[in-house]
């Protein structure tokens, strides 16, 4: 054992190749007791690869491990002798999660003692507070996996870690003894470390300690400084003190010194990030064994260097001189300044200035200081403090592909079609700069191709944003023209509103869209297209732009014809002679599945189950945009259209779009202005079915709030307040066309949609009817529509009870 060839090559590999951002650190010499002699093992020069753990936070080594010329694989440690290989547990390793550290030391000690490897040592079982503690030989259970209550003592200047219980302490051995074995108390002492290199990453570190060229005798590992950081010792001299021999039965090693790594474990209790005080830092420095050589400590620039004072290194077991504290500036780090690095000084270097290799500091520093001041002839991490910021000249903005591809005969201007879908931004159109003759072809149209069926039904935006391409009558794909960077200039050509405006014909050819002029287009004219007859039939639109197409498929050549056609639809959907206040419309299928909590019935048990989930408050279908939940997945799909802007139901008269077909049907009645929905109780007429339902509640629900000035009853107090305004003559919302006044802005807006001609006066009966209608419509404004069915409730409390 004493003749082992321990090459320092492995240590160089650890500090240079397998470790990045190595910082100079110094520690103390580690000695090891003797073991039975055996043949020398050739050193392959491969180090033990200590796991790459988290950064050290102002901590010093709390556990030490031997570096031997062996290798470590993904699942095991390979020693020089195959029979001594042992397997690591499968990842993830516990020390990465809960402050447990996996030390290679027990296996290495067992290797030296020619015994099977022990198990792991829990870090809490090591007493590092400098007080007298029990020896490990009196606590064999500390070698069991992760025994948190174990107590492994560290005596002054000596870390005692036994690979087994020794007979001298009266404890039973953990392993059977062979005939040639000698009872051994394997002990580590620390002395005369000439240099230690630490591959500590500076990511997210508050403070780091890096020690270079530190010597001392019997240093003590500080409390709370366990941090898993792999360190490598380049060379360790063999100068054990005579007092170490025989201490606790320790037998010193004779021969060349061993190469030693230092394993540190992060303390998750003390010295956290941004939580390290100056006293804690001083305590950590106190315990570093240093006497005559300098120590560099890398700190974050946010640390208050002014609060650091001279550090005294007199502790139990230490007799060292105090060291002075100074700050290394950027000039010193760049090589332009000088700092006193005498043997008794301790210098603090900002972590941003600490480099991996001290020989290349100047080269690496240039990457940190990126702003070069030509007047000062130096670099700064930010603006020059003397001359201020530099002047930057930005690049010329590059126009989009759509604008750059515009032919020279055309220009882009505001379109005569109007504004965008939102009704805010003006649309950009394509105008002619010179005469364009008839049968001039433009194209093909370039855009993004999509095979999604959802995009094929995307009709809420301008029609020319989605172009459907068919092959043998089957939709093949869609061309989307919404991104200027992906399309050409043809995306700006707008659709004509009537036949007089049309001067282009859009037609498909070989899976592409082309525009062809249908007439000579003079200068200063906007290009406006409409579809060819065949293409219009494919996509299901009228053959001419001024034709009104009803949802039933009928084409009307004039607005009057279209209005008359809509009226016929309304008469066909008039309620029957039965009470229209019944809960929900009639259905062709029988609703035999009735809810036990409300009067609703359903055509299938699955729909009843979904409805019942609403009563129970179960809403498993959640919106990814606003976290709103629904019990019915169809309601979620309808709700998602609000976020995506998908409105597939468009009014052919005013181009207003809706997310639901029922909303479109209710909107279409506004254009006719006819009140065809009749109340079965009082024969009052309404335009919208929703208004009729709300009105029926007046007849079916009891009104208990009475007006103090008249005998009229109300359902809510806010209705009474509005009614009192009518007694006082307060109608602040006046129609500019007919001078008719209303109590609320909502009712005035509804009136403006149907107001056709001025009216100077109104009869008293009309005023009274308007007041009643306003009251009824006020109820409809606050009505909560249950999405689980067609039920409507007059109060929020009723809706909650329904759900």
Curated annotation (Swiss-Prot):
Belongs to the class V-like SAM-binding methyltransferase superfamily. The keyword Membrane does not apply. GO terms for biological process: methylation; positive regulation of transcription by RNA polymerase II; transcription by RNA polymerase II. It is found in: Nucleus. It holds the Pfam family PRDM2_PR. The keyword GTP-binding does not apply. The gene is Prdm4. GO terms for molecular function: DNA-binding transcription activator activity, RNA polymerase II-specific; histone methyltransferase binding; methyltransferase activity; RNA polymerase II cis-regulatory region sequence-specific DNA binding; zinc ion binding. GO terms for cellular component: cytoplasm; histone methyltransferase complex; nucleus. May function as a transcription factor involved in cell differentiation. Residues 757-803 are annotated as: Disordered. This is PR domain zinc finger protein 4. Keywords: DNA-binding, Metal-binding, Methyltransferase, Nucleus, Repeat, S-adenosyl-L-methionine, Transcription, Transcription regulation, Transferase, Zinc, Zinc-finger. InterPro entries: PRDM4, PRDM4_PR/SET, PRDM4_Znf, SET_dom, SET_dom_sf, Zinc_finger, Znf_C2H2_sf, Znf_C2H2_type. A zinc finger (C2H2-type) spans 593-615, 621-643, 649-671, 677-699, 705-727, 733-755. Its main location: nucleus. Residues 408-532 form the SET domain. It comes from Mus musculus.
């Amino acid at each position: 054992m004493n003749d082992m060839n321990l090459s320092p090559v492995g240590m160089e590999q650890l500090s240079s190749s397998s470790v990045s951002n190595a910082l100079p650190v110094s520690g103390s010499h580690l000695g090891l007791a003797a073991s039975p002699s055996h043949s020398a093992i050739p050193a392959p020069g491969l180090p033990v690869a200590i796991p790459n753990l988290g950064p050290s936070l102002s901590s010093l080594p709390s556990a030490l491990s031997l570096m031997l010329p062996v290798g470590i694989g993904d699942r095991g440690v390979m020693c020089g002798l195959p029979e001594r290989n042992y397997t690591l547990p499968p990842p993830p390793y516990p020390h990465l999660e809960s402050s447990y550290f996996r030390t290679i030391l027990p296996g290495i000690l067992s290797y030296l003692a020619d015994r099977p490897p022990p198990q792991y040592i829990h870090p809490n079982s090591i007493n590092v507070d400098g007080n007298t503690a029990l020896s490990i030989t009196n606590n064999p259970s500390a070698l069991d996996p992760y025994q948190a209550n174990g107590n492994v003592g560290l005596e002054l200047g000596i870390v005692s870690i036994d690979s087994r219980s020794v007979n001298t302490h009266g404890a039973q051995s953990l392993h059977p003894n062979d005939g040639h074995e000698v009872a051994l108390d394997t002990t580590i002492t620390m002395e005369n470390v000439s240099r230690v290199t630490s591959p500590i990453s500076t990511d997210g570190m508050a403070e780091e300690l890096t020690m270079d060229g530190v010597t001392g005798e019997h240093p003590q590992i500080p409390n709370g400084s366990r941090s898993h950081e792999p360190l490598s010792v380049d060379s360790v001299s063999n100068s054990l003190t005579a007092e170490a021999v025989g201490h606790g039965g320790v037998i010193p090693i004779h021969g060349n010194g061993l190469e030693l790594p230092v394993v540190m474990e992060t303390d998750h209790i003390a010295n956290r990030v941004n939580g390290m005080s100056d006293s804690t830092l001083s305590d950590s420095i106190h315990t570093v064994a240093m006497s005559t050589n300098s120590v560099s400590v890398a700190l974050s620039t946010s640390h208050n260097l002014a609060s650091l004072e001279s550090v005294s290194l007199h502790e139990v077991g230490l007799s060292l001189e105090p060291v002075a504290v100074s700050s290394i500036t950027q000039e010193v780090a760049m090589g332009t300044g000088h700092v006193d690095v005498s043997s008794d000084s301790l210098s603090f270097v900002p972590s941003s200035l600490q480099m991996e290799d001290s020989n290349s500091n100047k080269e690496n520093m240039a990457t940190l200081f990126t702003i070069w001041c030509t007047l000062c002839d130096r670099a700064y991490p930010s603006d020059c403090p003397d001359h201020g910021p530099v002047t930057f000249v930005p690049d010329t903005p590059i126009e989009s592909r759509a604008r750059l591809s515009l032919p020279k005969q055309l220009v882009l201007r505001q379109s005569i079609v109007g504004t965008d879908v939102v009704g805010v931004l003006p649309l950009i159109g394509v105008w002619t700069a010179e005469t364009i003759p008839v049968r001039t072809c433009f194209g093909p149209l370039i855009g993004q191709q999509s095979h999604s069926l959802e995009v094929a039904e995307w009709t809420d935006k301008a029609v020319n944003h989605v172009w459907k391409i068919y092959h043998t009558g089957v939709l093949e794909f869609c061309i989307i023209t919404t991104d200027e960077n992906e399309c050409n200039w043809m995306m700006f050509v707008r659709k004509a509103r009537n036949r007089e405006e049309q001067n282009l014909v859009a037609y498909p050819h070989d899976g592409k869209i082309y525009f062809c002029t249908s007439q000579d287009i003079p200068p200063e004219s906007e290009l406006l297209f409409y579809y060819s007859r065949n293409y219009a039939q494919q996509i299901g639109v009228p053959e001419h732009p001024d034709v009104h197409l009803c949802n039933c498929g009928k084409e009307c050549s004039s607005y009057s014809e279209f209005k008359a056609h809509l009226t016929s639809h309304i008469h066909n959907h008039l309620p029957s002679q039965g009470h229209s206040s019944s809960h929900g419309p009639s259905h062709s299928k029988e609703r035999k599945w009735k809810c036990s909590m409300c009067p609703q019935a359903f055509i299938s048990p699955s729909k009843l189950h979904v409805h019942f989930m609403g009563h129970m408050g179960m809403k498993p279908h959640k919106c990814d945009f606003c976290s709103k939940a629904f019990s019915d997945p169809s309601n979620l799909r309808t709700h998602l259209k609000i976020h995506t802007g998908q409105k597939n139901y468009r009014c052919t008269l005013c181009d207003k779009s809706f997310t639901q077909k029922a909303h479109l049907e209710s909107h279409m009645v506004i254009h006719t202005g006819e009140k065809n929905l009749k109340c079965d109780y009082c024969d009052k007429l309404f335009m919208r079915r929703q208004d009729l339902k709300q009105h029926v509640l007046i007849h079916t629900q009891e009104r208990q709030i009475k007006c103090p000035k008249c005998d009229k009853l109300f359902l809510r107090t806010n209705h009474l307040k509005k009614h009192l305004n009518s007694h006082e003559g307060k109608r602040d919302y006046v129609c500019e066309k007919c001078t008719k006044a209303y109590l609320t802005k909502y009712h005035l807006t509804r009136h403006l949609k149907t107001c056709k001609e001025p009216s100077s006066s109104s009869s008293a009966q009309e005023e009274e009817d308007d007041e009643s209608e306003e009251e009824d419509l006020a109820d409809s404004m606050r009505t909560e529509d249950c999405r689980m069915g067609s039920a409507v409730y007059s109060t929020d409390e009723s809706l909650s009870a329904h759900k």
